[in-house]
UniProtKB/Swiss-Prot annotation:
SUPFAM superfamilies: Snake toxin-like. This is Alpha-elapitoxin-Lc2c. It is found in: Secreted. Disulfide bonds join C3-C20, C13-C41, C45-C56, C57-C62.
Amino acid sequence: RICYLAPRDTQICAPGQEICYLKSWDDGSGSIKGKRLEFGCAATCPTVKPGIDIKCCSTDKCNPHPKLA
């Protein structure tokens, strides 16, 4: 699987990691940058705490930055 790890950077995931994910959350700073983002690979869709949104998918490069999709 090939997943984004940053807005324009991809990586071939480790064996067994067939899920790409994109976590997003408001860091509470009121920043004009908007939400914080975390990209990655996983074996299963990660469990997140309340207030964190997560999108998981299982095709190559399926977790792009929302503004670059």
